[in-house]
């Protein structure tokens, strides 16, 4: 089964607290390990929560310090492991300038290539079995959200139809299920569409980054299996949310409702809500009727395949 598992490395906004690290999210997507943001202390959190260090790519939502300064130490740790495979770093405009500085801080030279890529709204990074889409969002500086969208899976295999067509059980069944045609002994060709149902949609994971509620995010999160949305503030901090271009928990929930997202996880909490996020949860649940949770450091979510 193709794995899609999230581990929250840091769930605090702006500054670390005793209980919450700065922003970082590890996503195990199929055989890949991805990071979305890498705040200070992220590598220690990866050790603590057992994600491993075999990271293929890092996607930065923006370049406020609390979202990317952890990459400096993380790259050096990767070098000490003897890594030789390249790592890909993605982010909004200014990524090349800022991340080039991060790569070259310190005396040690990298033992592996570091490839830096700048993204804009609508750009797509293809991966094996899925793609990561960049979504322009509304923050104080250039910022992106991300939608991880799996390829559709083949439809269900109709065993009775396959048998009626004379397909022998065994490897031929597997080939058809993988989308490959099979030639029978009598010369007939059985195509995958002859024995498979309609394609089954892949999963969709959407990560807001720091943002005000915005139409682009609603569009990206349409029918998402999971929306991870920042919820820095509560209702009584609405003015502060607008001023700093962040979201309240209620606003995050409204995005989830308007998008028809299947599940909502709130993260990036102000220190005011560090140990007691119950107000955020209550306000979100008043706006959105689907499952909603407040993330904490070490919180893990595994998304099941769609039927």
From Swiss-Prot:
The keyword Translocase appears for this protein: no
Taxonomy, superkingdom: Bacteria
Binding site for Zn(2+) 2: 66-67, 210, 268
InterPro entries assigned to the protein according to its UniProt record, in alphabetical order: Metallo-B-lactamas, RibonucZ/Hydroxyglut_hydro, RNase_Z/BN
EC assignment: 3.1.26.11
Gene Ontology MF, one: 3'-tRNA processing endoribonuclease activity
Annotated transmembrane regions: none
Cofactor: Zn(2+)
Cofactor note (record): Binds 2 Zn(2+) ions.
Active site annotation, chain numbering: 66
Record's catalysed reaction(s): Endonucleolytic cleavage of RNA, removing extra 3' nucleotides from tRNA precursor, generating 3' termini of tRNAs. A 3'-hydroxy group is left at the tRNA terminus and a 5'-phosphoryl group is left at the trailer molecule
Positions annotated to bind Zn(2+) 1: 62, 64, 139, 210
Keyword annotations of the record: Endonuclease, Hydrolase, Metal-binding, Nuclease, tRNA processing, Zinc
Assembly and interaction partners: Homodimer.
Function according to Swiss-Prot or TrEMBL: Zinc phosphodiesterase, which displays some tRNA 3'-processing endonuclease activity. Probably involved in tRNA maturation, by removing a 3'-trailer from precursor tRNA.
HAMAP family, per the entry: RNase_Z_BN (MF_01818)
Record-stated family: Belongs to the RNase Z family.
Descriptive protein name: Ribonuclease Z
Gene name as annotated: rnz
């Amino acid at each position: 089964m193709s794995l899609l598992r999230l581990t929250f490395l840091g769930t605090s906004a702006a500054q670390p607290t005793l209980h919450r690290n700065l922003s970082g999210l590890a996503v195990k997507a199929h055989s890949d390990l991805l990071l979305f943001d890498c705040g200070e202390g992220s590598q220690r959190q990866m050790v603590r929560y057992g994600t491993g260090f075999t990271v293929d790519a890092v996607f930065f939502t923006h370049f406020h310090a609390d979202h990317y300064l952890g990459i400096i130490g993380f790259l050096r740790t990767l070098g000490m492991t003897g890594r030789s495979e390249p790592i890909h770093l993605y982010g909004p405009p200014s990524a090349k300038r800022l991340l080039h500085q991060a790569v070259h801080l310190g005396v040690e030279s990298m033992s592996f290539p570091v490839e830096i890529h700048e993204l804009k709204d609508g750009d797509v990074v293809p991966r094996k079995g899925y793609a990561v889409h960049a979504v322009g969002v509304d923050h104080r500086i250039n910022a992106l959200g991300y939608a991880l969208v799996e390829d559709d899976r083949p439809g269900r295999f109709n065993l009775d139809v396959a048998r009626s067509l004379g397909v022998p059980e065994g490897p031929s069944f597997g080939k058809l299920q993988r989308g490959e045609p099979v030639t029978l002994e009598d010369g007939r060709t059985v195509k995958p569409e002859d024995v498979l149902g309609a394609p089954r949609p892949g999963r969709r994971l959407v990560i807001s980054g720091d943002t005000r509620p915005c139409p682009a995010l609603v569009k990206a999160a349409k029918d998402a299996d999971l929306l991870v949305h920042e919820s820095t503030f509560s209702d009584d901090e609405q003015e502060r949310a607008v001023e700093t271009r962040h979201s309240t928990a209620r606003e995050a929930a409204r995005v989830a409702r308007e998008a028809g997202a299947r599940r909502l996880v709130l993260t990036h909490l102000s220190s005011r809500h560090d140990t007691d996020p119950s107000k955020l949860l209550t306000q979100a649940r008043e706006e959105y009727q689907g499952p909603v949770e407040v993330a904490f450091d070490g919180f893990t979510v595994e998304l099941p395949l769609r039927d």
